[in-house]
């Protein structure tokens, strides 16, 4: 088994153990679901954070980017683990976080961390779970409005509910570590 395959196997086990729930849930998209992956639980777990950072860095290693970002709160631990491990790997990526609403005081900005970037810098956007792609697109627009170029979008989980297609229509190819089918099958074993 390759190193990447072993890392994915370990992360899948943690996601199923820590983040998978069955029940009646309303998703950020407004849709109802009989299962839910709260990836924040895994992303805030020491091993989970390390695995996510390693795997995202592996996905991004061939891209000419200056940093990674995502919508707060779900992307906060993803950005942190990815940036910290990028430095350890000798390819430092800076982080940025997109607010759902501007601060309303101070600089009144939607995007935090811009001081580490120059206008036109290329970045990748990170997301925990993609359902319709709406939250990720909102974050992408705010980052573009701030003057940065988005060259990749990555997620831990693609729920396979149209998000990949929506993102593609907007010019973004989704790089997901897992699909819903992969993780739900594993969870129900």
Please state what every model-predicted region is.
Residues 56-66, 140, 144-146:
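Phosphate/pyrophosphate-binding loops at sites that engage ATP/ADP/AMP, CoA/4′-phosphopantetheine
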Residues 1-63:
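Active-site-facing substrate-recognition patch
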Residues 63-74, 151-154:
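Short glycine-rich phosphate-binding loop at a beta-alpha junction
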Residues 79-124, 134-137:
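Short, glycine/charge-rich flexible loops or terminal/linker lids adjacent to PRPP-binding catalytic cores
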Residues 2-14, 141-189:
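PRPP-dependent phosphoribosyltransferase catalytic core
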Residues 127-140, 162-163:
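Acidic, divalent-metal-coordinating active-site segment for phosphoryl/phosphodiester hydrolysis
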Residues 29, 114-119, 146, 166-167:
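Solvent-exposed alpha-helices and their adjacent loops that cap or buttress functional pockets
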